[in-house]
UniProtKB/Swiss-Prot annotation:
Component of the mitochondrial ribosome small subunit (28S) which comprises a 12S rRNA and about 30 distinct proteins. The gene is MRPS12. This is Small ribosomal subunit protein uS12m. Its main location: mitochondrion. One of its GO terms (biological process) is translation. It comes from Pongo abelii (Sumatran orangutan). NCBIfam families: rpsL_bact.
Length: 139
């Protein structure tokens, strides 16, 4: 039995005996030493971009100030936000979800990733019910 025995049932263009061997080599591009020297080897994958939490699910932070922001064009509201100094040393603007909050300066909050769609530049959200940020009150 020849080496093309198992391939006998396939398309005849693939099983034309020795003609298959050069096609296998043609698909594999091999770099010369000169090309490797010029191009510097295989391309390196750039490091994965991490968000403001640097790959962590949540971060602790201290509230620096609270304020309201206006959303982008089709929406209209006053979104409650706060500037937080994270445990990594960075400062970030965070969205405070829910109705009513009692956050003040120097209070400790837990912050998670998750941007607010209509607030440009706000990529973090305060977790309600953890540390100094209370739960949303029932009506």
């Amino acid at each position: 039995m020849s080496w093309s025995g198992p391939l006998r049932g396939l398309n005849t263009s693939l099983t034309c005996g020795p003609a298959l061997v050069p096609r296998l080599w043609a698909t594999c591009s091999m770099a010369t030493l000169n090309q490797m020297h010029r191009l510097g080897g295989p391309p390196k994958r750039p490091p994965q971009k991490l968000g403001p939490t640097e790959g962590r699910p949540q971060l602790k932070g201290v509230v620096l100030c609270t304020f309201t922001r206006k959303p982008k064009k089709p929406n209209s509201a006053n979104r409650k936000c706060c500037r937080v100094r994270l445990s990594t040393g960075q400062e970030a603007v965070c969205f405070i979800p829910g109705e009513g909050h009692t956050l003040q300066e120097h209070q400790i909050v837990l912050v998670e990733g998750g941007r607010t769609q209509d607030l440009p530049g706000v990529k973090l959200t305060v977790v309600r019910g953890k540390y100094d940020c209370g739960h949303v009150q029932k009506k």
